[in-house]
Amino acid sequence: DITYLKQDEWHRTSTVLVDLNDQGERSFTFMVRPSADLFLETTDLPCWRHGEWLHLCSIALSAEPSRTSAFTAMTAIRHAGGFVSFDPNIREDLWQDEHLLRLCLRQALQLADVVKLSEEEWRLISGKTQNDRDICALAKDYEIAMLLVTKGAEGVVVCYRGQVHHFAGMSVNC
């Protein structure tokens, strides 16, 4: 369904090059700045319906007008009885102001039903090393229904309804 696809002759979709080092750590090179998605306006947003989902990441929060549009969308879908999934997917080189990044992350966490954090994002947001009690405390503080912290090859830790669940990573052969 491409009902809400908008074409813009002046802005292009970003191309991102991903490099993996020997330890499996990724680095990113963004080839188009600013990318078309950062020009999303509130007038581009649909009318949300009960039960619908919105998924977004912090890249949408890194610049205006997409920042205002993203927060407007998150609020609107919640009011309509829908749900918000948030994966910060932090790319620090897209943020010039760490204080603004933290403010935006806090606001997004308050509006999200499901949040997926990497271990690095967990440390940035919580200021702590990861343990089960702290994961559920963060979920409770922000009223997040399901909080997932991915641990690379070790799998994922999930806090859902105050209970912690551990799921092992799976080996994938390409």
Which residue ranges define each predicted feature?
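Conserved phosphate-binding/catalytic region of the ribokinase-like
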Residues: 75-76, 127-174
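Residue-level signal for inorganic ion chemistry
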Residues: 54, 87, 115-118
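Hydrophobic beta-strand scaffold residues
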Residues: 2, 84-85
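Structural recognition of alpha->loop->beta junctions
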Residues: 99-124
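Structural alpha-helical scaffold elements that stabilize or flank donor/cofactor-binding regions
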Residues: 46-47, 107-108, 138-140
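Conserved N-terminal subdomain of the carbohydrate kinase-like
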Residues: 1-57
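Active-site beta-loop-alpha junctions enriched in small/polar residues
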Residues: 33, 59, 89-93, 120, ...
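Charged helix-capping and loop-helix junction motifs
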Residues: 67-74, 98-106, 129-136
